[in-house]
Amino acid sequence: MLDRIKESSGSVLGFRFDGKLSESDYATILIPDLERAMGDHQNVRILLKIESFRSWRPGEGWDAFKQWPGLERVDRIAVVGGERWREWMNHLPGLFVGFAGIDVRYFPENRLRDAWGWLREGLLVPPQPA
C-alpha cells in the first residue's frame, strides 16, 4: 500500500510504503500526485518512507516510473527505512538506474526529520503566519 504523507507540501512530496506495493499504486497515487505538484513547481523532491514493507516486485510499475517523462524534474529522493534498506541500496545499484541527475540518499528511520530538512534545503519557503 502507498499513501501520501501529510507533511508533504509544495514541491516536496512524501509517500509511505506499507505492506505490499502494487503497480496500481504507481498509476493511481504516485504519478498523479507528482504530476499535480509539477503543475505548480519546476522540480519536485520525493521522500519514500518504508514501513512494515513485506513485498515488492519492481516489475512494470517500477520500470514505468523510471521511464516516466516527469522523472527529469525530480532532483532529490530521500529513502527512509530500516537498516535492511540501506543494505539493499548499497547492494542493488540497479534499483535506481535511470535516475541520472537525481540525488538519492538513504536516511535511517530515526532521522526522518533530517530527511525532510534535506529535501527542503535551498527551497524558498513562504513565511508562516504569526
Q: Can you annotate each of these PLM segments?
A:
Residues 2-130:
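Amphipathic, Lys/Arg-enriched alpha-helical "gate/interface" segment within cytosolic domains
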